[in-house]
Amino acid sequence: MLGAGLTGLSTAWHAQGPVLLVERADRVGGHARSVRRDGFTFDITGHWLHLRDPAIRALVEGLFLPGELATIDRRTRIYSHGALLPYPFQANLHGLPLAVVQECLVGYVAARERAARGAPEPTSFVGFAEDRFGAGIARHFFVPYNRKLWGEHLDALTAAWVSRYIPIPDTAQIVGGAIGLAQEGLGYNARFVYPTAGGIDHLPERMRAALASRPAAALELGCDVEEVDVVGRRIKLTTRADWQPYAALVSTIPLPELVRRIPGAPAAVRDAAASLRHVRWRWLDVAVGAPVPADWHWAYVPEPRLPFFRVGVYSNAAATMAPPGCAGLYVELTDRTGPIDLPAVLAGLVELGALRDPADVRFVEAREVEHAYVVFDAAWEAARATLLGWLEGQAIRSCGRYGGWVYNGMEDCLIAGRDAATWASGHVPKEARA
């Protein structure tokens, strides 16, 4: 099992036979990890658990004592044209300049009329936004926000990922939201679960501790994979001199990285891996030594003039993530490569209501990860199918957010691990199963 993020931990958790779980880092969790400094706790931006699968909910809740998990109703806002709107934008236009509201409603009506005439389904993400919500809503939210998130990849983005993650209100909700009847609670993430002690790393650490009591599950940290020999069904690890045989190999490392470790991969597989694209991430952890005006958990910021596209207040979800009277923020930056204009960021946070005064800031830490979002372009579907199909023919299941090269959440990763364990059981000899 390659990678001890949530997918890898879940695979080991559900495994029916002996499993060796290896992780390159010095701790488990993958992107579901936390850092702590001076009484503040920061995740890798917002990691809120949205639980719908009953078995996964039972797994998570079983790791914590009563009172150690909080169920929280989402408080999310959108900052547009100087107004702080409830989420989602398309169902809460009230508060925007009247000309913008009119443009959005007229565009929505025109889009519905086109749909009634049987207009073809769009294939691009921008086309989806314009077709489903109209040109105005697309122009004032979906295009500018996603331009900041996806950068240069937006124009190539398909609509393959939108069905679950973008709320689609009906006409009554859109009209109601435009005249001031707030339409909240829409979307897949209207409620979330989070450790009351602060820090999403409590989840993978609880799983690690539970797995430590299972003789059939071995965890090796600080261990990377050098090479996979698919002919001999063996793997070379950085911490071991000898090749390690495998009956079934489950990998959660980024899909292109796995293929690069397989010298025997055919040209078509290598080409498919080379065609995959991703978005890297840069954000700021901001420790504030005073209360902040914001009462929301996170806010989307489509305004092009502001240097960030999403801001969250950790301590509004779990007060333990900051010292008493303080607040902890995450600020997701639009620019992923250039110098950070911190005064501009802090001024924008004041405008947003996430900060009262820049002088309240105790410290700021800039952080980044290479793999954040996979890009759903025209090559994605066929390339992914080629890769996953070939790998399974070699007794390799590549899964999870980056192993499966998909857009998903933490619960999905836990489900993917459960499914991978079921798959692996078909490759492990019966006498070796627990």
What are these regions (language model features)?
Residues 38-117:
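Dinucleotide-binding Rossmann-like beta1-alpha1 core, especially the glycine-rich loop
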Residues 14-37:
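Glycine-rich FAD pyrophosphate-binding loop
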Residues 1-21:
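N-terminal Rossmann-like FAD-binding beta1-loop-alpha1 element of flavoenzymes
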Residues 83, 93-94, 100-227, 231, ...:
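Active-site/ligand-binding neighborhood in enzyme catalytic cores
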Residues 7, 27, 256:
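Conserved Rossmann-like nucleotide-cofactor binding loop
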Residues 71-73, 219-223, 239, 400:
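Short loop/edge segments at beta-strand edges and connector loops
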Residues 246-248, 252-397, 403, 408, ...:
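C-terminal segments that line or cap access tunnels to active or ligand-binding sites in enzymes
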Residues 414-430:
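Internal hydrophobic alpha-helix adjacent to the cofactor/substrate pocket in enzyme cavities
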